[in-house]
Swiss-Prot record:
Its EC number is 2.7.7.7, 3.1.-.-. This is DNA polymerase. The keyword Nucleotidyltransferase applies. It comes from Thermococcus hydrothermalis. Gene3D superfamilies: DNA polymerase family B, C-terminal domain (1.10.132.60), DNA Polymerase, chain B, domain 1 (3.30.342.10), Hedgehog/Intein (Hint) domain (2.170.16.10), Helix hairpin bin (1.10.287.690), Homing endonucleases (3.10.28.10), Intein homing endonuclease, domain III (1.10.8.1330), Intein homing endonuclease, domain IV (1.10.10.1010), Palm domain of DNA polymerase (3.90.1600.10). In addition to polymerase activity, this DNA polymerase exhibits 3' to 5' exonuclease activity. PI-ThyI and PI-ThyII are endonucleases. PI-ThyI cleaves the inteinless sequence of the Thy DNA pol gene. It requires a 21-bp minimal recognition sequence. GO terms for biological process: DNA-templated DNA replication; intein-mediated protein splicing; intron homing. This protein undergoes a protein self splicing that involves a post-translational excision of the intervening region (intein) followed by peptide ligation.
Length: 1668
């Protein structure tokens, strides 16, 4: 059997040229052995290709790229299929074809373990085994139980077990994690005590081999079936202990006995019976699980065509891929290649997902479970969805997917549908051979198998450093922080399976080396990965001081047999030689610092005094003239007289091209952006006559300055208003790099409050050498002008210098870093930085080595990376007294010494390699130069020397392992997946680590992936599900409960075509574009909604559609004040804010943002979210325009205008009272002097003024009064610049606003009798970022003793500080009072650091409503502001028949199945999957049900954590029993009250209160000290050894002070001296375990304690208690 690939040629005549192509492999020439032309199919179309044969399987990877590069070759195919797999496929070999009944037997071992012991040190205490007939335990201590067999020694026990296996002779040996524990442990013990480990049928020992990041064990003549990888691939669980898996699969709990308990029992002799029972049950449940899972793996083995041993250890993605490859061969199809980067980018674009069911909360009886049989595969088959049928030309008939419109040919059957048809048939056979079709276990396993993605993650710990290239910039990250941040930002794109998460990424590259040439390069990162890990980790320390900590399965690159091979953390040992960089290749370019971009990244308050200036010379009237020209080009103005001047300027920028007559636009989009810039510039720019310059405040243009072409920007200066200014671009050349080096080594940047309450800034560079200070001074003055010089420092008192150094390099010694731009600068610039750093903080060690010192770990890694980029690899790192020292054992260009020989020098070939290569003894290592000399003189064999040629010519050197430290670890671990090279630089000091492989099918990199196919399948799926829901509701009486929607008049904040609108949601719905079930959809374009991202920032997100439907559900009105409310359906999610101790400080904001239904308000969530950040754009304003808007605000508040009189045509009136003189000076005189108003004069009433201005009178009538003559605020104001809105509000609040203190709290209100006007004022306040509320006086206003028929409406300011800062008052008396009131008042709201404020619901009530309800889809966040409150948008349902008995529900369900299946096309079929007697639903992912056999199934409610006490677990189990078995919620409440009462009275045995928590890191690394850490530190202080992995079992005692101080080890608990803290166990253990269950029935935490009186809250108003 010969290896081969396929080649498609442009011309068959070129085959002879192709056959002549050669490549090299291990010193021999590789070429095509022979070629033949064959007829194949490619995506269903006939094709003729050449089949190229080769001599050896390794010839294919050696030559394939050379063949592909040939000009006559279109492409090559099937070049990446491993030879062994190729053989199985081509020969049609199928394992597990027989139908024999296989004998199965499981086994498990218990071992003696002491903290810190090496694996296999402690003896095996018990071996248990189970088969169909019995479950027994063999041990060597006396235990009197019928199933226990006692022998004399451990050796006799193992011999007895081997004899049992031989006697029973099982075909299948079942273990749970036997690959990685039981077999390896048995093998170690057999070696130690001198027994041959004969488990194979031929009498030989099991073969233990590595497979990915794990081990795999083969037992010749038997199948070793390890359940662990099968279950990890198949079922999604929070933890994969045997106990958790057994309970998830069978619904029955299993006792857990911890290793420390086993050790104690064995050594004391007490409790051995319990350990024996536990051991027996381990074997028994492993056997039971094996019986359940083995048949499906056997069938899968037949389908895939691989052995069951392989299949059970493979990921789902790999299995599907190999199945398709086999079928493609059988059908004469060539397999498509995996996608290139361009195709991959297209595939990665998102599409709408499938339908999501949202269960109705509460307790329900008689629940039927209906499910589509293989929904997506059935759709694929029914509609012939396949890459080879998509948009296939020349077909007579097509099926078109709903909503997305993709077409699929029906004339010929597609490749994928044809295979899935056979698969579904096979699946039905499997189902018939297994349990009845309603078995939820079997259904669950098959369903998970279709969807499961298993990632094999070799991983690093979170603290490890990785250098990455992002958008051309080199950055150093801790891998945990980097991956966590990416996954938090793009959480909706993270693919999850079990406890593994994968996020595919773009635009990120890793530093790696080519596995073949060993040359360094930069390669794309395909994905970032994290997963939960519990096991051993290995800290590997190298001779150079480099170090890295990896999981047991993570590989580094070690030298062996002439090559670099992957060696796992568990295999690496002292003396191994690992790959580290000799040189790294970083992207290189001339770097330039763009100060404008740097300033744009700073907060607005940091740049408040920054200005841009440009000389007037040559630019007189330039800005206005340019804007007029741009408007003329757009057809909005006449041609300016000087247009030619501006057209020439635009031509120079590339926007237009001048002709002999006229011009043409060459860049329309660029021109539009340029105009947007000038619209703002003309508003913002002002003339400074003193300096003959134009001046612009940076903040006025910060959001448009990026639009300024570089050719223009370079003419400006940037700096502080009254201080130093500099060019906006700084070239990063040698001098600037050296100055940065000086700063990083011995500089600091500082800012402080000065005596005027402003900020002062300075940068200082220190050195004792006056010549160095001279150089520092010269460089600093070149870039920053005049500086100050002290005895041993240079001071740069410039804010711009502070900004540059602080942002590029950091400020404190502990956080200094190499500036990003230095890494990618030319080599001479990098050397200049190193020189500056060396002069500032380096020295020459007595050993003639350069020594660089720093306190910053980030800087150490940056220096090493920088030196590596310069080809310097002879580096040694040491850490002493808090200081890192980097020793460089090479001559550097700027040092004036000659390096002498030194013991540490990486540019040598280690003698161990020389001895292995040449087969003789070498006395010492040899330098590269000496080695070449020895080879050239033929003293060394030239042919043998070629084996290590890569070491001389590559970019990798070897570093010896000094020590390996092993410790346990539990927590997240991380990895990258790097394209092609499969390695990346990582760790402290940087060394090469192997990356993760991850396989998948149905994702963008799969061979047969088709984005349009996936999009169409989900669209059809949504359509069929919603149609089915509609039918079951309308025709069969099932109630459909939608989990969404708000009422039609609800106002939302949108931006349409760039303009902000406050619009009723029903007004967005203009037409019905399509229907799904009873829901109607209107597609929107150019609409964005205001929403909140997970970082707490207000952002605009696209709204693709608005949806509406009729509902018969309850509608609730949530009242915030007596006039501010929100109407929502009963189960619509609002976004609440957890402002409690339940969320620990420092946790991401998204952990505080929780979805909450109206009925849950007032329980754990008491506050909702309202916006509190400016969303109106800012400009550089005209001061007179500000005064005009202040006047308009005063008029709306205390003015009058309009009417039929002659006076009204020319005047407006303003009532000013005692404030007349102040307003006259501040507003009226300046407006009169500038001609905005003609005049003003006193009226008859004191303080009243008439303002003469014909245009103003017309303007106020046209825009500020409605048809009835009432005052209003026009909609155009919602899109005014922020400063003008603030000016208007300032005038309005000055007229009608009040300032007061109420119960010591500052109060600011605006009062009117016009609700519509007040509502508009609220919108303006939101636009400028001032949170507010509104309420109406319940008592009517009175005038002259009589009711006036009006009520006062108060707009109340929530964020008073923001109001004072941005708006304030015109009147000194009000402004002074506000300042005094706020003087001693500071807001403690944590929310104020984000873009929102909190609002507290006052009441929830049901209302009558008969109309459409609406929802919008908001991309990315799925949230929008409705009536000023943040809500969630969803789209799901859950259905049942309320009140019907079990038989009726079953009968109706089956009738419906018969009806709907007759209507569904093709293979689509709805199945009866099960029936549940009772169930309750907390949310869509948290529920519990009980079937007719009494089996309880839970999801999302399990307590499996070690750090919960037995009393918490026991109470939750009893609560579930009461609700599900007895249907009695009140009984469940009584149980909780009873437990809390017993706890309070100290009637609970202390054994049930023990909490077990593991130490996961070194004690010194803990910042927060939990109880277990506090105990561990006290134990360590006593001399007891505490390592990561140690489990602390403790109990919390009654008393005052920190919990950690009151927690003691349980073995120190003395009931005669100690009392446990009942309150702690009630509040932190028992109630949290049951609260999330019972809150579904309206109970609050305080109602579950026996001693508390019952309180009535929002939940009581909603009458949610009891069952439905």
């Amino acid at each position: 059997f010969e290896p081969y690939i396929y080649a498609l040629l442009k011309d068959d005549s070129a085959i002879e040229e192709v056959k002549k192509i050669t490549a090299g492999r291990h010193g021999r020439v590789v070429k095509v052995k022979r070629a033949e032309k064959v007829k194949k199919k490619f995506l269903g179309r006939p094709i003729e290709v050449w089949k190229l044969y080769f001599t050896h399987p390794q010839d294919v990877p050696a030559i394939r790229d050379e063949i592909r590069r040939h000009s006559a070759v279109v492409d090559i195919y099937e070049y990446d299929i491993p030879f062994a797999k190729r053989y199985l496929i081509d020969k049609g070999l199928i394992p597990m074809e027989g139908d024999e009944e296989l004998k199965m037997m499981s086994f498990d071992i218990e071992t003696l373990y002491h903290e810190g012991e090496e694996f296999g040190t402690g003896p095996i205490l018990m071996i248990s085994y189970a088969d169909e007939g019995e479950a027994r335990v063999i041990t060597w201590k006396k235990i009197d139980l019928p199933y226990v067999e006692v022998v004399s020694t451990e050796k006799e026990m193992i011999k007895r077990f081997l004899k049992v296996v031989k006697e029973k002779d099982p075909d299948v040996l079942i273990t749970y994690n036997g690959d990685n524990f039981d077999f390896a442990y048995l093998k170690k013990r057999c070696e130690k005590i001198g027994i041959k480990f004969t488990l194979r049928r031929d009498g030989s020992e099991p073969k233990i081999q590595r497979m990915g990041d794990r081990f795999a064990v083969e037992v010749k003549g038997r199948i070793h079936f390890d359940l662990y990888p099968v279950i990890r691939r198949t079922i999604n669980l929070p933890t994969y202990t045997l106990e958790a898996v057994y309970e998830a699969v069978f619904g029955t709990p299993k006792e857990k006995v911890y290793p420390e308990e086993i050790t104690t029992a064995w050594e004391t002799g007490e409790g051995l019976e319990r350990v024996a029972r536990y051991s027996m049950e381990d074997a028994k449940v492993t056997y039971e699980l094996g019986r359940e899972f083995f048949p499906m793996e056997a069938q899968l083995s037949r389908l895939i065509g691989q052995s069951l041993w392989d299949v059970s250890r493979s990921s789902t993605g790999n299995l599907v891929e190999w199945f398709l490859l086999r079928k493609a061969y059988e059908r004469n199809e060539i397999a498509p290649n995996k996608p290139d980067e361009r195709e991959l980018a297209r595939r990665r674009g998102g599409y709408a997902g499938g339908y999501v069911k949202e269960p109705e909360r509460g307790l329900w009886d008689n629940i039927v479970y209906l499910d589509f049989m293989s929904l997506y595969p059935s759709i694929i088959i029914t509609h012939n969805v396949s890459p080879d049928t998509f948009n296939r030309e020349g077909c007579k008939e097509y099926d078109t997917a709903p909503q997305v419109g993709h077409k699929f040919c029906k004339d010929v059957q597609g490749f994928i549908p044809s295979l899935l048809g056979a698969l579904l048939d096979e699946r039905q056979k499997i189902k018939k051979r297994m349990k009845a079709s309603i078995d939820p276990l079997e259904k669950k396993l098959l369903d998970y198998r279709q969807k499961a993605i298993k990632i094999l993650a070799n991983s690093l710990l979170p603290e490890e450093w990785i250098p990455l290239v992002e958008n051309g910039k080199v950055r150093l990250h801790r891998i945990g922080e980097f991956v966590d941040k990416l996954m938090e930002t793009d959480s909706e794109l993270v693919k999850r399976n079990g406890d593994t998460e994968v996020l595919e990424v773009r635009g990120i590259r890793a530093l790696s080396f080519d596995r073949k040439s060993k040359k360094a390069r930069v390669m794309p990162v395909k994905a970032v990965i994290r997963h939960r890990y519990s096991g051993d980790v290995y800290e590997i320390v190298l001779g150079s001081g480099r170090r890295i900590t990896v999981t047991e399965g993570h590989s580094l690159f070690a030298y062996g047999d002439g090559e670099l091979r992957e060696v796992t953390g568990g295999e690496i040992k002292a003396g191994d030689l690992l790959a580290v960089p000799r040189r790294v290749n970083l992207p290189e370019k001339k770097e330039r610092l763009n100060l404008v971009e740097l300033l744009r990244r700073l907060p607005e308050e940091e740049t408040g005094d920054i200005i841009l200036t440009i000389p007037v010379k040559g630019r007189k009237n330039f800005f206005k003239g340019m804007l007029r020209t741009l408007r003329w080009i757009s057809g909005e103005e006449k041609r300016p007289r000087t247009a030619r001047r501006y057209l020439e300027h635009l031509e120079g920028l590339g926007y237009v091209r001048l002709k002999k007559i006229g011009y043409e636009v060459t860049d329309r989009e660029g021109l539009e952006r340029y105009r947007k810039l000038y619209e703002r510039l003309v508003e913002a720019v002002r003339y400074n006559g003193n300096k003959r310059e134009y001046l612009v405040e940076f903040n006025a243009v910060r959001d448009v300055i990026a639009l300024m072409p570089e050719e223009e920007l370079r003419d400006w200066l940037v700096g502080t208003r009254n201080g130093f200014r500099m060019r906006p671009f700084v070239e990063i050349e040698e001098d600037f790099a050296k100055l940065l080096g000086y700063y990083v080594s011995e500089g600091n940047a500082r800012k402080w409050r000065n005596q005027k309450n402003g900020w002062s800034y300075t940068v200082k560079l220190y050195n004792e050498n006056q010549r160095v200070l001279d150089d520092m001074e010269s460089l600093a003055e070149r870039f920053f002008g005049r500086v100050k010089r002290g005895k041993n420092y240079i001071e740069i008192p410039r804010k711009m210098a502070y900004i540059i150094f602080e942002n590029l390099c950091g400020t404190l010694a502990e956080n200094k870093r190499v500036p990003e731009a230095i890494f990618t600068s030319p080599e001479s610039v990098r050397w200049a930085f190193i020189e500056g750093y060396f002069i500032g903080d380096g020295d020459v060690h007595p050993s003639k080595r350069v020594r660089l010192s720093t306190k910053s770990e980030l800087l150490v890694n940056g220096l090493v990376l920088l030196l590596n980029s310069l080809g310097v690899s002879a580096i040694k790192i040491r850490h002493d007294s808090g200081v890192y020292r980097v020793y460089v054992n090479e001559e550097l260009p700027f040092t004036d010494y000659r390096k002498k020989k030194n013991a540490y020098y990486s540019h040598v070939i280690p003698k161990e390699i020389l001895e292995e290569t040449f087969g003789k003894v070498f006395q010492r290592s040899v330098s590269y130069e000496k080695f070449r000399e020895l080879v050239k003189s033929e003293k060394l064999d030239g042919e043998k020397a070629k084996r290590i040629e890569w070491l001389l010519n590559g970019d990798v050197v070897l570093d010896k392992v000094l020590e390996v430290k092993k410790r346990p670890y539990e927590g997240y671990v991380y990895d990258l997946s790097v394209e092609e090279d499969e390695n990346f630089l990582a760790g402290f000091g940087l060394l090469y680590a192997h990356n993760s492989y991850y396989g998948y099918y149905g994702y963008a990199r799969a061979r047969w992936y088709c984005k349009e196919c996936a999009e169409s399948v989900t669209a059809w799926g949504r359509d069929y599900i919603e149609t089915t829901i509609h039918e079951i509701e309308e025709r069969f009486g099932f109630k459909v409960l939608y989990a969404d929607s708000v009422t039609g008049e609800t106002e939302i904040i949108i931006k349409r075509n760039g303009k902000v609108e406050f619009v009723a949601i029903e007004e967005l719905f203009q037409r019905v574009d399509y229907r799904i079930g009873e829901k109607e959809y209107c597609v929107l374009e150019g609409v964005e909604a205001l929403t909140l991202d997970n970082r707490g920032r207000l952002v605009w997100k696209s709204v693709p559609y608005v949806m509406r439907h009729r509902t018969n559900k309850r509608i609730y009105r949530v009242w915030f004040t007596n006039s501010w409310y929100l109407d929502v359906t009963e189960d619509h999610s609002l976004i609440g804010y957890m402002n409690t101790s339940k969320v620990k400080p420092g946790k991401p904001l998204k952990e505080r943002l929780v979805e909450v239904k109206p009925g849950e308000l007032g329980e754990s969530v008491k506050s909702l979210i309202t916006p509190n950040r400016a969303i109106a754009h800012g400009i550089r304003v005209n001061p007179i325009a500000v005064k005009l808007w202040e006047l308009i605000g005063l008029l709306v508040g205390d003015g009058n205008w309009g009417g039929q009189s002659n006076w009204a045509k020319y005047n407006v009136g303003l009532s000013l009272g005692l404030d007349k003189e102040e307003i006259e000076e501040k507003i009226l005189k300046p407006l009169k002097n500038t001609g905005i108003i003609s005049n003003y004069y006193d009226k008859s009433k004191k303080g009243d003024v008439s303002i003469l201005s014909k245009w103003l009178a017309r303007f106020m009538v046209r825009y500020f009064k409605d048809e009835s003559g009432s005052k209003r605020i026009p909609e155009f104001m919602f899109n005014l610049p922020r400063e003008y809105i603030e000016a208007f509000l300032r005038g309005l609040f000055s007229a009608d606003g009040t300032v007061s203190l109420r119960k010591g709290v500052p109060e600011v209100r605006l009062t009117s009798v016009n609700p519509e006007l007040s509502s508009s004022v609220r919108k303006l306040l939101w636009l400028v970022g001032v949170s507010n509320s509104m309420f109406v006086e319940t008592n009517p206003n009175r005038y002259l003793g009589k009711e006036s028929g009006t009520h006062s409406v108060h707009v109340r300011i929530k964020d008073k500080h923001r109001f004072a800062e941005r708006i304030g008052f015109l009147l000194d008396r009000k402004a002074t009072k506000l300042s005094e009131n706020l003087g001693g008042h500071t807001s403690k709201k944590r929310a104020y650091k984000y873009d929102f404020d909190l609002v507290y619901p006052k009441k929830v009530e049901e209302i009558a409503y008969d109309g459409y309800v609406y929802d919008i889809e908001v991309e990315g966040t799925h949230r929008f502001f409705a009536n000023g409150i943040l809500v969630h948008n969803t789209d799901g349902f859950f259905a049942t028949i309320p009140g019907a008995d079990a038989e009726t529900v079953k009968k109706k369900a089956k009738e419906f199945l018969k009806y709907i299946n007759a209507k569904l096309p093709g293979l689509l079929e709805l199945e009866y999957e099960g029936f549940y007697v009772r169930g309750f639903f907390v949310t869509k992912k948290k529920y519990a049900v009980i079937d007719e056999e009494g089996k309880i199934t839970t999801r999302g409610l399990e307590i499996v954590r070690r750090d919960w006490s037995e009393i918490a677990k026991e109470t939750q189990a009893r609560v579930l029993e009461a609700i599900l078995r007895h249907g009695d919620v009140e009984e469940a409440v009584r149980i909780v009250k009873d437990v809390t009462e017993k706890l309070s009275k100290y009637e609970v045995p202390p054994e049930k209160l023990v909490i077990h928590e593991q130490i996961t890191r070194e004690l010194k690394d803990y910042k927060a000290t939990g109880p277990h850490v506090a105990i561990a530190k006290r134990l360590a202080a006593r001399g007891i050894k505490i390592r990561p992995g140690t489990v602390i079992s403790y109990i919390v005692l009654k008393g005052s002070g920190r919990i950690g101080d009151r927690a003691i080890p349980f073995d120190e608990f003395d009931p005669t001296k100690h009392r446990y803290d009942a309150e702690y166990y009630i509040e932190n253990q028992v109630l949290p375990a049951v609260e999330r269950i019972l809150k579904a029935f309206g109970y609050k935490k305080e109602e579950l304690r026996y001693q508390k009186t019952r309180q009535v809250g929002l939940g009581a108003w909603l009458k949610l208690k009891g069952k439905k």
